[in-house]
């Protein structure tokens, strides 16, 4: 009953507002039901067919699309020969007689009628696919310090409209800096690659964009609804687009002696995803203004950026750009339509009445419809911003490094947020709250900075997702579980055949043995490397190919290639591709920002889950 309904909640500031609730009464229980909203624009994906050689034959896997009915079945073909006697319901198949030279297709069967064949898939020789990269040459700073490049965070979008994802990759110089550190950095480079390694373009953000996790937040999404993804990010004088055109003054250099850029114009540019061509450039907002307004005068807190994609009207995507979270905080929303950028709203914590929204942001954000109106809200650390740019609530618990938003507790209506907090004087070092109202459902005092926290269903003995932080594991109700915790507090990934989530850290995937309280290794990707130092995050984690399980993208140790790893473990569970889930897809868009976090779904995906709701979507 829980997952077939969603409570339409009042915001805290709207005590007198009239809220329409459709009430379903069963015995003594009352379940508020969300009215059906408008369909959302989503990507027109192909089958994502993948075939991988295993010891038991060829493992074949494909997408179940959000546009398809639950009754659809499939036929699997090898070299034009149908393999299954009767149509199969699963979205994976093991061909025991396949060979390395085989080619596979699948055909949907709708009401007994076979549909056209999918794209063809050749067999991978190993459980990963290599995407060769054009590694850039290093350089030298104005102080004579040399640097090299390594592949860093990535995102995905269908930039050419063929139904297959392309990879958008950030190159990080070896001298990239945290905002707290002085020093010059190399230029930030952004590349686009097809999965066969074809490089589509390279954007050089130039000397006036500093390199580091908090500076460049790149959004890859079909913003204008033409069926092809754009790329949006902060730019500056000297940025060179994918066609070689320079934005602004090519000779300008605003770096000070500390290598920081605290003066000069700032721009927001939308680039064509297929070519890297500049489509439109506007003045960047939130604007810098006075550096000292943001919490210090040397340029640390002024340049703390985040970004995201949100369906503010419930139907089409908008761009969110943010600045600041330790003190002054600003969020600005834009639409990119018909070749033009238009600003929708600004939330500024320095404005009268917004004081509660200062100093509450994280190094990450989440985006979801938390109040049931069909329109997305921005979960900005310890606060939330409504689709219209007005603050919904602030818990006052302040900044933190990790944040998880989803249906963490299926035993109660709506979505929840699990967050850790940095302030040692905060009432809670880790908190579990109602995503719509900010009500703290439970929390644990820490008395110190709790730097990491994770949420995933890893123990079927307890309903909902478990959460762990500060050396302890808890149920969704706040009950402490045992004395051990998983081997990592980083990412979670759906990898094996059950509905529980595995742990992803560095170049490893582990599974929590809940009965014995230890983690067991499932995969160690030899020759692959994680990113971002001690954060040890993947280049990307997402449901990129095949069935609903997730792929992980790591760089090779020398950054000569990216490797897309996929599971080869059969599963009886069939779910719509996670990339057609509204919360999950937006989680992939924001995954590259600042301190990367794993995506979550709009519904509870775990042991004992109810039937997954069919995505309410359309494709351009």
Curated annotation (Swiss-Prot):
Binding site for Ca(2+) 9: 496, 498, 500, 502
Cofactor remark from the record: Binds 10 calcium ions. The calcium may have a structural role. Requires calcium or manganese for activity.
Consequence the record notes for mutating residue 452 to A: Strongly reduced catalytic activity and reduced affinity for substrate
Protein residues bound to Ca(2+) 2: 158, 160, 162, 164, 166
Binding-site residues for Ca(2+) 7, renumbered to this chain: 407, 409, 412, 414, 416
Binding site for Ca(2+) 6: 371, 373, 377, 386-387
Residues annotated as binding Ca(2+) 10: 543, 545, 547, 549, 551
Biological process, per Gene Ontology: cell wall organization
Start and end residues of each stretch annotated as Disordered: 133-152
Effect the entry attributes to changing residue 535 to A: Strongly reduced catalytic activity and reduced affinity for substrate
Task of the protein: Pectinolytic enzyme that degrades type I rhamnogalacturonan from plant cell walls and releases oligosaccharide products. Degrades rhamnogalacturonan, polygalacturonic acid, pectic acid and pectin.
Family listed: Belongs to the polysaccharide lyase 11 family.
Protein name per Swiss-Prot or TrEMBL: Rhamnogalacturonan endolyase YesW
Organism listed in the record: Bacillus subtilis (strain 168)
Gene name in the database record: yesW
């Amino acid at each position: 009953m829980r997952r077939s309904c969603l409570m339409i909640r009042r915001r805290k500031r709207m005590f007198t507002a009239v809220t329409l609730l459709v009430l379903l009464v069963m015995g003594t229980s009352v379940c508020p039901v969300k009215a059906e909203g408008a369909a959302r624009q989503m990507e027109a994906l192909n089958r994502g067919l993948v075939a991988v050689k295993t010891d038991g034959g060829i493992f074949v896997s494909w997408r179940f699309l959000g546009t398809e009915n639950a009754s659809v079945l499939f036929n699997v073909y090898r070299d034009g020969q149908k393999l299954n006697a009767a149509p199969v319901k699963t979205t994976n198949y093991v061909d025991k007689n396949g060979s390395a030279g085989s080619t596979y297709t699948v055909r949907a069967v709708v009401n007994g009628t076979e549909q056209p064949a999918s794209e063809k898939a050749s067999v991978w020789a190993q459980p990963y696919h290599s995407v060769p990269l054009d590694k850039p040459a290093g350089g030298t700073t104005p102080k004579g310090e040399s640097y090299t490049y390594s592949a860093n965070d990535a995102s995905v979008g269908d930039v050419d409209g063929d139904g297959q994802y392309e990879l958008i990759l950030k190159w990080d110089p070896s001298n990239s800096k945290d905002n707290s550190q002085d020093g010059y950095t190399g230029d930030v480079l952004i590349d686009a690659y097809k999965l066969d390694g074809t490089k589509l373009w390279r954007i050089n953000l130039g000397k006036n964009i500093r390199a580091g996790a908090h500076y460049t937040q790149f959004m890859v999404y079909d913003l204008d609804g033409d069926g092809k993804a754009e790329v949006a990010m902060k730019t500056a004088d000297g940025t060179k687009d994918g066609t070689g055109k320079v934005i602004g003054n090519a000779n300008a250099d605003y770096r000070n002696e500390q290598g920081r850029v605290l003066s000069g114009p700032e721009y927001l540019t939308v680039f064509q995803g297929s070519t890297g061509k500049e489509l439109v450039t506007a003045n960047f907002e939130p604007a810098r203004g006075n550096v000292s307004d943001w919490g210090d005068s040397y340029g640390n807190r002024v340049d703390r950026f985040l970004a995201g994609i949100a369906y503010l009207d419930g139907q089409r995507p908008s761009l969110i750009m943010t600045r600041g979270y330790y003190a002054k905080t600003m969020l600005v929303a834009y639409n990119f339509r018909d070749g033009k950028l238009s600003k929708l709203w600004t939330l500024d914590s320095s404005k009268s009445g917004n004081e509660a929204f200062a100093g509450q942001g994280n190094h990450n954000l989440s985006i979801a419809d938390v109040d049931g109106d069909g329109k997305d809200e921005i979960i900005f650390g310890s606060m939330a911003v409504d689709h219209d740019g007005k603050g919904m609530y602030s818990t006052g618990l302040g900044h933190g490094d990790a944040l998880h938003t989803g249906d963490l507790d299926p035993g109660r209506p709506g979505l929840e947020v699990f967050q850790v907090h940095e302030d040692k004087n905060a009432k809670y070092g880790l908190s579990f709250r109602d995503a719509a109202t900010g009500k703290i459902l439970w929390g644990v005092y820490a008395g110190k900075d709790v730097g990491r926290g994770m949420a995933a269903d890893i123990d079927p003995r307890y309903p909902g997702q478990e959460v762990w932080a500060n050396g302890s594991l808890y149920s969704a109700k706040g009950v402490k579980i045992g004395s051990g915790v998983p081997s990592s507090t980083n990412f979670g990934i759906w990898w094996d055949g059950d509905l529980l989530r595995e742990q992803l850290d560095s170049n490893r995937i582990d599974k929590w043995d809940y009965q014995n309280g230890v983690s067991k290794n499932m995969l160690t990707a030899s020759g692959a490397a994680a990113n971002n130092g001690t954060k040890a995050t993947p280049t990307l984690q997402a449901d990129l190919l095949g069935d609903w399980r997730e792929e992980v993208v790591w760089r090779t140790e020398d950054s000569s290639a990216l490797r897309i790893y996929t599971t080869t473990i059969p599963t009886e569970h069939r779910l719509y591709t996670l990339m057609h889930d509204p919360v999950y897809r937006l989680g992939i868009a924001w995954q590259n920002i600042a301190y990367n976090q794993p995506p979550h779904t709009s519904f509870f995906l775990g042991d004992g889950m109810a039937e997954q709701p069919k995505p309410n979507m359309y494709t351009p």
